[in-house]
C-alpha cells in the first residue's frame, strides 16, 4: 500500500521532516515487532482530534502498526539522538527503546510526532532490552490523559498494545508498546548533544528546524536565536506553574525530559501530591529531593541554563557577549514564573485583580496548609464550595484568621458570588489522577479488568466538573505507614 492509499484508509497524513536534519541527530531503524500482540487501549477521542479513522485503527490493521509489525509506507522510522543531565550528570542518551514512525499533519496544518515506545533495542539502547512493561505504559496513558483534561500541555497516548511477551524487570511482567503523540520530541538534551558532539552548522540546523516547527513567528527575525531562547523560557515558566497549581510532581526533571515545545513528557516516577508539603518526593531514586515539589521551578531554571549554554555560539560570535545575553534571558525566568504563579493562585482564590498584599494572602494559606498537613486539591475544592469538613486545618486559628482576610479581599473585587465561584471552579480541579486511584486501575488492568481504568479515564476528561458522579474520586487514600513510592518504569 502506498502512502496515498494508506492516508485514505487511516487518516494519517505522513511526513518525516526530522530526516532533513544532519544525520548525527538520528539513526534509521525498523521496530522489532510483536509475535502475539493485542490492542488493549485505543484513544478514540484523540484519534478524532487528529482526524484519524478510528474504525480502521481500532482493528487488526491498526494493531499491526501499534505493535511495530507494520511501518508507515514511504516513511523511514528513526531513533533520535540526544544527551541529558541526569540528576545533574551529563551523559549521552538517545531513544533506547523508542522509534519515531513519522509526523502526522492535521487538516489545520498542526504537526505531531507518532512514536512507538517499547518497540525494541536501538543503537542507543546501551544495556537496556528496548522493551516496556504493561503497567508503566498504562500509567503514562492514564496520567497524560489526566494532564490533558486538566488543561496542561502534554504528550498524549494514542494506543497501548500488549505484545504477548514477558519482560524481565524486578520480576517478569507483561510486555507492552505505547504509541505516543507529541508536538515533537526535541529536548533540551537534543541541543546539549548538538553543542557537545556536533558542529556549529549542526547546532544551527537544529535551531532553525525547531524555530520553523514551533516558533515560526520569529523565523525571519534578526535576533531569532535570542528570541528562541526567550520563547522557550516563557513556555517552561507557564508549564511549571500549571504543574504546581495542581500538585503534579514530575519526579525526573532531567534535561532530556524537558521538551522545547513546552509539553510535559515522560511520565516515569511522577505522581500527584495529596498532603501539601513543598518537600514532597515520590521517586525511589531521588534520595536528596532534587526534584521535590517545591524545587521544580529551580530545576526548570537549571535546565534552561543548560539550554542557554548550548545556544551560546548562536547568540553572539563573541563568547562574553553571548554569555551576557544568556544570563539576561535566563534571569527573566524567575520573574515570569512569579508573575504566572501569583496570577494562577489569585484565580484559584476567586480574585480577578491584582492587589499589593495578595502575595502575603496566598503564602499565608499555603503555610497554614503545610503546617496542618491539608490535602492540596481538596482544600481548594472546599474553598470553592465554601464547605469545610473533615480537615483539621479548617478549625485552626490560623485558618480562621486567614479566611477573614480572604473574605475582605473578595469584597474589594465587587464581583458576584457566582462570578467568584465560576472563576474558582475553572481553576480548582474537583478531581485529579490520585496515586491510589491510578494504582488500583493498573492492578486491575494487569489482571485483564479495565472497568475501573475506563471509568477513571472518563472522569478525568472533565476534572473541573463539580459533579456528584465524580465525588468518589475525591476521597483520600487510607492512611498508611508506608510512603507512596514511584519508579522509572516508563
Swiss-Prot record:
Keywords, A to Z, come to: ATP-binding, Magnesium, Manganese, Metal-binding, Nucleotide-binding, Nucleotidyltransferase, Transferase
Disulphides: none
Q: Which residues does UniProt mark as catalytic?
A: 256 (proton acceptor)
Question: Where is Mg(2+) bound in this sequence?
Answer: 257, 266
Q: Which reaction does it catalyse?
A: L-seryl-[protein] + ATP = 3-O-(5'-adenylyl)-L-seryl-[protein] + diphosphate; L-threonyl-[protein] + ATP = 3-O-(5'-adenylyl)-L-threonyl-[protein] + diphosphate; L-tyrosyl-[protein] + ATP = O-(5'-adenylyl)-L-tyrosyl-[protein] + diphosphate; L-histidyl-[protein] + UTP = N(tele)-(5'-uridylyl)-L-histidyl-[protein] + diphosphate
Query: What EC number(s) has UniProt assigned to this enzyme?
Result: 2.7.7.-, 2.7.7.108
- Per UniProt, ATP binds at 94, 96-97, 117, 129-130, 180, 187, 266
Q: Name one GO molecular function term.
A: AMPylase activity
Q: Which cofactor does it need?
A: Mg(2+); Mn(2+)
Principal EC category? transferase
InterPro entries on file: SelO
- Which Pfam family would be a valid example here? SelO
Query: In UniProt terms, what function does this protein have?
Result: Nucleotidyltransferase involved in the post-translational modification of proteins. It can catalyze the addition of adenosine monophosphate (AMP) or uridine monophosphate (UMP) to a protein, resulting in modifications known as AMPylation and UMPylation.
Sequence similarity: Belongs to the SELO family.
Q: Which PANTHER family match?
A: PROTEIN ADENYLYLTRANSFERASE SELO, MITOCHONDRIAL, SELENOPROTEIN O
Q: Which NCBIfam families has this protein been placed in? A: PRK00029.1 (NF000658)
According to UniProt, the name of this protein is Protein nucleotidyltransferase YdiU
Q: Which organism is it from?
A: Clostridium perfringens (strain ATCC 13124 / DSM 756 / JCM 1290 / NCIMB 6125 / NCTC 8237 / Type A)
The gene coding this protein:
ydiU
Amino acid at each position: 500500500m502506498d502512502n496515498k492509499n494508506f492516508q485514505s484508509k487511516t487518516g494519517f497524513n505522513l511526513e518525516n521532516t526530522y530526516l532533513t536534519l544532519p544525520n548525527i541527530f538520528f539513526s534509521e531503524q525498523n521496530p522489532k515487532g510483536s509475535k502475539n500482540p493485542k490492542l488493549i487501549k485505543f484513544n478514540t477521542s484523540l484519534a478524532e482530534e487528529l482526524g484519524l479513522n478510528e474504525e480502521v485503527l481500532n482493528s487488526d490493521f491498526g494493531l499491526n502498526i501499534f505493535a511495530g509489525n507494520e511501518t508507515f509506507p514511504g516513511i523511514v522510522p528513526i531513533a533520535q539522538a540526544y544527551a541529558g543531565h541526569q540528576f545533574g550528570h551529563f551523559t549521552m542518551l538517545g531513544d533506547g527503546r523508542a522509534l519515531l514512525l513519522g509526523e502526522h499533519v492535521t487538516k489545520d496544518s498542526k504537526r505531531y510526532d507518532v512514536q512507538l515506545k517499547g518497540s525494541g533495542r536501538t543503537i542507543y539502547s546501551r544495556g537496556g532490552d528496548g522493551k516496556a512493561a504493561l503497567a508503566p505504559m498504562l500509567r503514562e496513558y492514564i496520567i497524560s490523559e489526566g494532564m490533558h483534561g486538566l488543561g496542561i500541555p502534554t504528550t498524549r497516548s494514542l494506543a497501548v498494545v500488549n505484545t504477548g511477551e514477558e519482560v524481565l524487570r524486578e520480576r517478569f511482567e507483561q510486555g507492552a508498546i505505547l504509541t505516543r503523540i507529541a508536538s515533537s520530541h526535541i529536548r533540551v538534551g537534543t541541543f546539549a548533544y548538538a553543542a557537545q558532539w556536533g558542529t556549529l552548522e549542526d547546532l544551527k540546523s537544529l535551531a532553525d528546524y525547531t524555530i520553523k516547527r514551533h516558533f515560526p513567528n520569529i523565523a525571519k527575525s534578526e535576533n531569532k536565536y535570542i528570541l528562541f531562547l526567550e520563547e522557550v523560557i516563557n513556555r517552561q515558566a507557564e508549564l511549571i506553574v500549571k504543574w504546581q497549581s495542581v500538585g503534579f510532581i514530575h519526579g525526573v526533571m532531567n534535561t532530556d525530559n524537558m521538551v522545547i515545545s513546552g509539553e510535559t513528557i515522560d511520565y516515569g516516577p511522577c505522581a500527584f501530591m495529596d498532603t501539601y508539603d513543598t518537600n514532597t518526593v515520590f521517586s525511589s531514586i531521588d534520595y536528596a529531593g532534587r526534584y521535590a515539589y517545591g524545587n521544580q521551578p529551580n530545576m526548570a531554571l537549571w535546565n534552561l541554563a543548560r539550554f542557554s549554554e548550548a545556544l551560546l555560539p548562536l547568540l553572539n560570535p563573541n563568547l562574553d557577549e553571548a554569555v551576557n545575553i544568556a544570563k539576561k534571558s535566563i534571569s527573566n525566568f524567575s520573574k515570569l514564573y512569579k508573575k504566572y504563579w501569583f496570577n494562577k493562585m489569585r484565580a484559584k482564590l476567586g480574585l480577578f485583580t491584582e492587589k499589593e498584599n495578595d502575595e502575603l494572602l496566598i503564602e499565608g494559606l499555603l503555610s497554614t496548609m503545610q503546617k496542618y498537613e491539608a490535602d492540596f486539591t481538596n482544600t481548594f475544592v472546599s474553598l470553592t464550595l465554601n464547605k469545610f469538613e473533615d480537615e483539621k486545618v479548617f478549625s485552626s486559628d490560623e485558618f480562621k484568621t486567614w479566611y477573614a482576610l480572604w473574605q475582605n479581599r473578595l469584597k474589594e473585587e465587587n464581583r458576584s458570588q457566582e462570578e467568584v465561584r465560576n472563576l474558582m471552579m475553572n481553576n480548582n480541579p474537583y478531581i485529579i489522577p490520585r496515586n491510589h486511584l491510578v494504582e488500583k486501575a493498573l492492578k486491575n488492568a494487569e489482571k485483564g479488568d479495565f472497568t475501573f481504568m475506563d471509568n477513571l479515564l472518563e472522569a478525568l476528561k472533565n476534572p473541573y466538573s463539580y459533579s456528584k458522579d465524580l465525588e468518589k474520586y475525591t476521597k483520600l487514600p487510607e492512611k498508611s505507614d508506608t510512603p507512596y513510592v514511584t519508579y522509572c518504569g516508563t
